[in-house]
């Protein structure tokens, strides 16, 4: 219970994903995990740094490559739930309910996939059984009760099928998730498999092409921008720092601040307020007012949380998850938000000095200096502008560790306190999500 309360007291993570690894030596060897930092996690699996998983520790299978990820999770707990269900489809209640004929909210098609073959992973196997005296010894020794079960090996297309069914399930179908491919041949395999099924993914689940995949000209939004590679994945809050600065500037002086929906005054210190993420829009609204407006415009009547909506001022389509990420970071991580803006202000000043020098060389007057939009020192008047965050601050703030790391050695358990925390492998049989 304490972990759940701590999870809800943190901001929505800047990035969290479930990933699929493939051995570059043997493509049939696959592994599923979750992480807030794909680049760091991949180095752990490949043994470059400590903290990998037991199933990826074999040197004969290394190096591993991250071929695809499912991103957009709003909490670490949500990513762990999805990871466990993807790893154990035969035991997940989300896929059992889907097999029993429960449709995801908002879906209209009831046609089953053309390929109706049941994957081996979808059939739960008994975890333990007693020895039957009538069974011949030639059949082998039954497993002990406390013996770790062996997960049946699944093919790439089976992982595709399980992922497809999870995204159709009632629990996950309304989450703002996206699938990002880093490997061109894996994307082609997905495309060939997906073309053979009759049920489409929910309309809001986008397919993003990255890495060695061909570029998609339609993939131009901020949330769908290409990383280029796993190592270049944007996993910190820098991607929303301009949005964060604008929101803090608009809400800093609430004297003439009013809700664009209900037209009443907004009290930022007493009420939750959201700001349009569009750069040129200054629309501010009460959280409840805007959510009700978005929900009324959604086609699904039973939806409890909006996915997107049109800004009341600029009419641009804005993502609800992006607005909630900014709101949670502004309200739950104020000190970290101020530190980010301090660093941004310092970089802006440095850029202005460079621009001035270039303009001076060309004889152009460039004395205009953009003033700081927000009083960054209001929470600590003695704080210095040089007090900035370390480069790895997000690794400690967003998540203590990834979902599944290798078992600790005795030496690691006695490591210095400033070393990165390593969590036990998430594949343990004692994990259970109700």
Curated annotation (Swiss-Prot):
The keyword Zinc-finger applies. GO terms for biological process: double-strand break repair via homologous recombination. Residues 104-113 have a biased composition (Low complexity). Its main location: nucleus. InterPro entries: GIY-YIG_endonuc, GIY-YIG_endonuc_sf, Slx1, SLX1_C, SLX1_endonuclease, Znf_RING/FYVE/PHD. Its EC number is 3.1.-.-. It is found in: Nucleus. GO terms for molecular function: 5'-flap endonuclease activity; crossover junction DNA endonuclease activity; zinc ion binding. Residues 96-154, 362-381, 399-434 are annotated as: Disordered. Gene3D superfamilies: GIY-YIG endonuclease, Zinc/RING finger domain, C3HC4 (zinc finger). Residues 14-97 form the GIY-YIG domain. Residues 422-434 have a biased composition (Acidic residues). Residues 142-153 have a biased composition (Basic residues). Signal peptide: none annotated. Its cofactor is a divalent metal cation. One of its GO terms (cellular component) is Slx1-Slx4 complex. Catalytic subunit of the slx1-slx4 structure-specific endonuclease that resolves DNA secondary structures generated during DNA repair and recombination. Has endonuclease activity towards branched DNA substrates, introducing single-strand cuts in duplex DNA close to junctions with ss-DNA. Forms a heterodimer with slx4. This is Structure-specific endonuclease subunit slx1. It comes from Aspergillus clavatus (strain ATCC 1007 / CBS 513.65 / DSM 816 / NCTC 3887 / NRRL 1 / QM 1276 / 107). The gene is slx1.
């Amino acid at each position: 219970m304490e972990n759940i309360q701590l999870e809800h007291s943190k901001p929505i993570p800047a990035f969290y994903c479930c990933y699929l690894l493939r051995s570059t030596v043997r493509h049939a060897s696959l592994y599923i995990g979750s992480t807030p930092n794909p680049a760091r996690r991949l180095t752990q699996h490949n043994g470059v740094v400590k903290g990998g998983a037991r199933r990826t520790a074999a040197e004969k299978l290394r190096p591993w490559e991250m071929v695809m990820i499912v991103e957009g999770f709003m909490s670490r707990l949500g990513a762990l739930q999805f990871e466990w269900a993807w790893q154990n489809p035969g035991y997940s209640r989300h896929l059992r309910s889907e097999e029993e004929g429960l449709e995801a909210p908002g879906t209209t098609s009831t046609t089953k996939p053309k390929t109706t073959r049941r994957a081996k992973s979808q059939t739960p196997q008994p975890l333990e059984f007693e020895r039957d005296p009538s069974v011949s010894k030639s059949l082998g020794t039954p497993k002990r009760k406390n013996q770790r079960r062996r997960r049946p090996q699944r093919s790439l297309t089976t992982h595709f099928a399980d992922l497809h069914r999870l995204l159709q399930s009632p629990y996950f179908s309304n989450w703002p998730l996206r699938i990002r491919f880093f490997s061109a041949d894996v994307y082609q395999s997905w495309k060939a498999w997906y073309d053979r099924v009759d049920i489409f993914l929910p309309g809001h689940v986008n397919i993003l092409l990255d890495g060695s995949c061909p570029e998609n000209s339609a993939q131009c939004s901020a949330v769908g921008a290409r990383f280029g590679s796993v190592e270049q994945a944007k996993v910190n809050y820098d991607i929303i720092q301009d949005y964060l600065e604008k929101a803090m500037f608009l809400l800093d002086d609430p004297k003439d601040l009013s809700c664009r929906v209900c037209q009443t005054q907004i009290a930022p210190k007493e009420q939750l307020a959201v700001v349009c993420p569009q750069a040129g829009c200054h629309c501010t609204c009460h959280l409840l007012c805007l959510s009700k407006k978005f929900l009324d415009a959604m086609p699904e009547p039973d939806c409890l949380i909006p996915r997107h909506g049109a800004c009341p001022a600029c009419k641009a389509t804005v993502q609800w998850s992006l607005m909630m990420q900014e709101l949670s970071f502004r309200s739950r991580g104020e000190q970290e938000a101020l530190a980010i803006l301090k660093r941004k202000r310092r970089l802006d000043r440095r850029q202005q000095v460079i621009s001035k020098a270039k303009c001076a060389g060309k004889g152009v007057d460039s004395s205009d200096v953009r003033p700081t939009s927000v009083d960054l020192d209001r929470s600590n008047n003695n704080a210095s502008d040089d007090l900035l965050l370390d480069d790895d601050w997000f690794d400690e703030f967003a998540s203590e560790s990834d979902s599944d790391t290798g078992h600790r050695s005795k030496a690691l358990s006695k490591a210095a306190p400033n070393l990165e925390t390593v969590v036990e492998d998430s594949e343990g049989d004692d994990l259970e999500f109700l």
